[in-house]
């Protein structure tokens, strides 16, 4: 029996607590290295690309939010790229670890990478987000669905509706939830290697452990105790009907924990990907049972919890995004070349 399979069975009492601790240790060690690592200069976008560093005012969060931005042209649709559990405050993990701006240059899609949001699940928290660095306000859903699209529309000529949102790991479930509740804004949602049933089973306990390690945050400050309605409200498995009713175009990816020549050949990355895969398969079944018919499912026979695979998926989905968002490539623009 595979290691990950041993943790998926039912457990109660002492065995359940031991299971949470064991899985939590693996999750934490995986998150430390693979959901937002250290920035290296060579990983950033090449010089010459028209990447801007915006300071977007947020009344909801009481501060300016840094957003890395690349225009897709006048009246272009937007792609919001959301970071992982260990999102940094200086640059987006998407820019640190992938050439995302390069891939989407002249695609006709404006790319927005909000910076920050460690352990936030890009949600509106009940309470202040208090961690090792102090307390701040997390109202990310309000920012992403109201303040940021209004700013980009007014200042950068970006369409406020008909956008796409893609997230990895922590933010994969966030991307689906944002699309479920804001269908006019997000007609496309991509989830990469996410836990898609966070409110169920040991999910709240594991999320609490991970958030505590990634910044010292408390899950109860985010969504309250595990039986609070906010947990169900932010659970893609329980909100799959909304995605089907909205006819949202979704792209769901998860590997199986086996590395390929892309990399990620280490125990934490392998374990974590294998662990979340089951929830992705269940989500597919729930989507199909609800009558969904507008999805791409990539459950590869390889892939670990690491940026190499998430980047490959983002690059692969570009034509699908362009088609769904109605983007017009601007290959005649030589800016940034």
UniProtKB/Swiss-Prot annotation:
InterPro entries listed in its UniProt record: AB_hydrolase_fold, Esterase-like, Mycobacterial_A85_antigen, TAT_signal
Keyword Methyltransferase: no
Keyword entries, A-Z: Acyltransferase, Cell wall, Cytoplasm, Disulfide bond, Secreted, Signal, Transferase
Signal sequence residues: 1-42
Disulfide bonds: 130-135
Keyword set includes RNA-binding: no
Pfam families: Esterase (PF00756)
Alphabetized GO MF terms: diacylglycerol O-acyltransferase activity; trehalose O-mycolyltransferase activity
Gene Ontology annotations for the cellular component aspect, listed alphabetically: cytoplasm; extracellular region
Record-annotated active site: 169, 273, 305
Enzyme Commission number(s): 2.3.1.122, 2.3.1.20
Residue span of region Fibronectin-binding: 101-111
Catalytic activity: an acyl-CoA + a 1,2-diacyl-sn-glycerol = a triacyl-sn-glycerol + CoA; 2 alpha,alpha'-trehalose 6-mycolate = alpha,alpha'-trehalose 6,6'-bismycolate + alpha,alpha-trehalose
Compartmental location: Secreted, Cell wall; Cytoplasm
Residues reported in the UniProt entry to bind substrate: 85-86, 169, 197, 275-278, 282, 305-307
Family statement: Belongs to the mycobacterial A85 antigen family.
Function: The antigen 85 proteins (FbpA, FbpB, FbpC) are responsible for the high affinity of mycobacteria for fibronectin, a large adhesive glycoprotein, which facilitates the attachment of M.tuberculosis to murine alveolar macrophages (AMs). They also help to maintain the integrity of the cell wall by catalyzing the transfer of mycolic acids to cell wall arabinogalactan, and through the synthesis of alpha,alpha-trehalose dimycolate (TDM, cord factor).
Record text on subunit structure and interactions: Homodimer.
The protein's name in its UniProt record: Diacylglycerol acyltransferase/mycolyltransferase Ag85A
Organism name: Mycobacterium ulcerans
């Amino acid at each position: 029996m595979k290691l990950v399979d041993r943790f998926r069975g039912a457990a109660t009492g002492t065995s359940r607590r031991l299971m949470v601790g064991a899985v939590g240790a693996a999750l934490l060690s995986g998150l430390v290295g693979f959901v937002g690592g250290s920035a290296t200069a060579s990983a950033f976008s090449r010089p010459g690309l028209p990447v801007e560093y915006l300071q977007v005012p947020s009344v909801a969060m009481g501060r300016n939010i840094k957003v890395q931005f690349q225009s897709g042209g006048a009246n272009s649709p937007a792609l919001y790229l959301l970071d992982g559990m260990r999102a940094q405050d200086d640059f987006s993990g998407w820019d640190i670890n992938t050439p995302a701006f390069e891939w989407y240059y002249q695609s006709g899609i404006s790319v927005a990478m909000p910076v920050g949001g460690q352990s936030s699940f890009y949600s509106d928290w009940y309470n202040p987000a208090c961690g090792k660095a102090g307390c701040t306000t997390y109202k990310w859903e309000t920012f992403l669905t109201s303040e940021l699209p209004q700013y980009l529309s007014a200042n950068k000529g970006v369409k406020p509706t008909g956008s796409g949102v893609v997230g990895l790991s922590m933010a994969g479930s966030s991307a689906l939830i944002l699309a479920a509740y804001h269908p006019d804004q997000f007609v496309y949602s991509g989830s990469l290697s996410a836990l898609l049933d966070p409110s169920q089973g040991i999910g709240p306990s594991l999320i609490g452990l991970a958030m505590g390690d990634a910044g010292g945050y408390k899950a109860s400050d985010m969504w309250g105790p595990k039986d609070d309605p906010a947990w169900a409200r932010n659970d893609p498995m329980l909100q799959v009907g909304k995605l089907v009713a909205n006819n949202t175009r979704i792209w769901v990816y998860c590997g199986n924990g086996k590395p390929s020549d892309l990399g990620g050949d280490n125990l934490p990355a392998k374990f974590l990907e294998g662990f979340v895969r089951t929830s992705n398969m269940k989500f597919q079944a729930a989507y199909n049972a609800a009558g969904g018919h507008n999805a791409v499912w990539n459950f590869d026979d390889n892939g670990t919890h690491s940026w190499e695979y998430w980047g490959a998926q983002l690059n692969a989905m570009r034509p699908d995004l362009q088609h769904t968002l109605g983007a017009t490539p601007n290959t005649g623009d030589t800016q940034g070349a």
